[in-house]
Amino acid sequence: MNPPIARQLNLDETKLPAEIFERLSRRGATLKDYRRRREEAIENFGKPGRDPAELGSVMTTIAGNGVWAANMKLAQLRNHWDQVVGQAIASHSAVADFTDGVLTIRAESTVWATQLTYLIPQLTDTIRRNLKGLTITEIRVTGPAAGYTRKWARRR
């Protein structure tokens, strides 16, 4: 006849019930905690400090912290471009890109690109004054992108 399994596996027979029922006792403890938290939530309902926050204030807090701040300032610059450079220039230019502190402005024509090039010091001061969270190290002005030109093959 075979010896009991506890001896075969070198287990302590006095500890077996505790090992078996440990999982059930942990589950019972979590159920007790769940009931206690539920009762506390019911008791604390409506007390000061538990009022819901307005969505706008929560989103402002989230947008103002972390990596969103620079993107929000850039979006603000794009949306209010006419207030930065004036209506006449804004109708012929736009913010094209912002990467690693370099702001790229795309102009409608080379004439407007030249005009914006002369305004770079004033633009830098205005942007730094109005958008304090946006760090601009350089402003580049580009003219219109060269369109696709097809090279016609000459026939001999």
Swiss-Prot record:
InterPro entries: DciA-like, UPF0232_actinobac. Belongs to the UPF0232 family. This is UPF0232 protein BL0636. It comes from Bifidobacterium longum (strain NCC 2705).
